[in-house]
Amino acid sequence: MITAQTFRLDGRLAFVTGSSAGIGLALARGLAQAGASLVLNGRDATKLRATAASLRAEGFEVHERAFDVTDAEAVKANVDSIERDIGAIDILINNAGIQRRAPLHEFSHQDWHDLMQTNLDSVFFVGQAVAQHMITRKKGRIINICSVQSELGRPGISPYMASKGALKMLTKGMAIDWGPLGLNVNGIGPGYFKTELNEKLVNDTTFSAWLTNRTPSRRWGEVEELAGAAVFLASDASTFVNGHILYVDGGVTAQL
């Protein structure tokens, strides 16, 4: 029987990468509101400490680990440290990501490398390190933050599209390999949300007018609106959901 308790995350530890601000912070706060304890992650230790302190002031149990998720050795060391010193990771959200905008024929090799490292390699590194622990317990939830660009394209962001399209298939591959071992691996595909990453687009009146007309819900998303999807995929309400990408996009992917 489904009740409100089915969606509760009390007693569970959630590790969220790229969670010092924006979508990652909104996801972390949503999990905490459902009862989870948190481990936040980011590269900027000062910013991360401030974010953790603000969440603690809201009454949540919060830890932080500042490290670069594109560094495989640092990932392994920190995941092992979390498991040893804080507790077993029940929920992983791979949220860290970056954007670079340029026509493909002008896109630098370094920007391509940086984007793929952050948006794709890090998910493999963190996902593998956490899954190795989850597999020993025969349970765990992994949620990868994909994008509507896992399905749809726009000019000037081809490498980003490639990274998010690959992430969609990596998510499915993780579910195929790790599902038989007790893990549930799914993705969330955000549409267009008001974030620091999209600040220029939000302030571009021409683009905003096009986007709101293109979106059946006729507006930009607010980051808090992603939290429900994360809580669902992290909770006992989704025990038979595996290898799925849940698009939270106001209907953008529903129409041409």
What are the functions of these language-model segments?
Residues 2-6, 152, 231, 242-256:
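Short C-terminal tail/terminal secondary-structure segment
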Residues 147:
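Residue(s) in the substrate-gating loop at a strand-loop-helix junction
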Residues 105, 152-158, 180-181, 218, ...:
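Active-site loop immediately N-terminal to the catalytic Tyr-X3-Lys motif
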Residues 13, 20-21:
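Conserved glycine-rich cofactor-binding loop
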Residues 127, 163, 171:
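Active-site helix of classical SDR
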Residues 103-104, 111-116, 142, 207, ...:
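Substrate-binding pocket helix/loop in short-chain dehydrogenase/reductase
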Residues 132, 176-180, 239:
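Alpha-helical segment proximal to the catalytic Tyr-Lys
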